[in-house]
Amino acid sequence: MADNAQVVPVEEPAATATATATATATTEPEAKSSDQMESQSDNKPPMGTLMALVNILAAGVLPIFTFVLSLTLLGYAVWLLYMRSYDCEDILGLPRVQTLASVGLLAVFVVSNAALFLRRKFPMPALVVMVVVLLLMLFIGLAYAGVNEMQSRRFPATRMWFKLKIMDDHVTWNNIKSCVYDKGACNDLIYGSPNEKPYNRRKMPPIKNGCCMPPETCNMDAINATFWYRRKDEGPPSSMNLMYGDEMMVGRISDCQLWRNDWSILCYDCRSCKFGFIRSVRRKWWQLGIFLIVISILLLMSHLLIFLATFWERFKG
């Protein structure tokens, strides 16, 4: 019996093989998904890299940019201090205003750099002080640029202030008129009148165009630059629009009637002469207003970014 016994090989059940294959198949996607997650995590910048970028901005790029930006305040202040005042500006007290503007720009320069130096110890007070100072500078710049006309009359050397001081104050204008005459504003036209006619008024300074010649709308013919006569077949215009740069003003018939061929009178009493003087002295203050608007906005944005970077650095540190 023992010799006739046969050994039967034991085969693995099919279910066991199927389960093994299924387990192998399920582990492969899990391994792939884990590999993908690891690769994605490797692509994301670590927190240390982000903090390093914030530190570079807070400690290097933004402060240097703000300091360089504040140097324009210093340069403009020095330029105002050494810039020669226009003739007869002292009658209006504008040289004193020019000096005060220079001192104000120097003060803003000092405050801006002090805020940079103390930004880590006192970030919030430094930001508040700079916001107040820069908003005040922006408000003054809007007044000088003529954007806020209702408030600009309160500030010297603004458009409305010039109108009140020159157009509506006859005593002040008489003093300015005497000064303009004494400075010889029309002398080069009187003693060296150009021969070519009609004269190119656009190339002339505003004060020469307004004070030394009659308005173009008076329809006068010229013998030379300072001697004109009215055409007999044409009377004075019923109204005239005088264009002075960016301003359209409605003139008066009296401008044509006030013209005299006397060298001491010419058109010094005309409204066109007043507008010419205003244009000559106002351009510098209009440029100051544009500068204050631009630099205050840039400094405000720069200091705000520095505050945010410093706050983020403290929060993550």
UniProtKB/Swiss-Prot annotation:
Membrane-spanning ranges: 61-81, 97-117, 127-147, 288-308
List glycan-bearing residues: N224
Q: Where is the composition biased (Low complexity)?
A: 7-28
Positions on the Extracellular side per record topology: 82-96, 148-287
Q: Which domain of life is it from?
A: Eukaryota
UniProt keywords (A-Z) are:
Glycoprotein, Membrane, Transmembrane, Transmembrane helix
- Give the membrane topology: Multi-pass membrane protein
Question: What InterPro entries would the database entry show?
Answer: TET_plant, Tetraspanin/Peripherin
Q: Where is this region: Disordered?
A: 1-43
State its location(s).
Membrane
Segments on the Cytoplasmic face: 1-60, 118-126, 309-317
Q: Does the keyword Signal apply?
A: no
> Which GO BP terms sit in this record?
auxin-activated signaling pathway
Cellular component, GO annotation: membrane
What Pfam families has UniProt attached to this entry? Tetraspanin
Q: Which PANTHER family match?
A: TETRASPANIN-8-RELATED
What is the role of the protein in this entry? May be involved in the regulation of cell differentiation.
What does the sequence similarity comment in the record state about its family?
A: Belongs to the tetraspanin (TM4SF) family.
Q: What protein name does the entry list?
A: Tetraspanin-15
